[in-house]
Amino acid sequence: MSLIPRPERSPGALRAACAVVAPGLLSAYDRAKDRALAEAVEHGSLKPVHAYLAHWAALIEIERHPAVARRYHCAEYLARLATTPEEAREHLTTASALYREAATWSGQAVSS
């Protein structure tokens, strides 16, 4: 079950979705957008903007699904607490798998 429909992959739609599913991340979202726009101007390329939109679409996709968000944040937290590289790797593997799956789903045009 998702909290909200999948937003369009546009700055305004992603920010609005972030405000609902992860309001604590709004300042990070705004900083990332500003950084991507500055890099786009500096390099004369839209690649930084596309990367920022893809990254935030994946994060919003994770946050849209509370159970997935809990697993993702738990894995990141446990990786930070890990006492061995192997333990950290195990938790980061879980987090990265969830992120990759979310990135795949967030690239789809149809809301679910």
Where are each of the predicted segments found?
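Amphipathic alpha-helical interaction modules
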Residues: 25-69
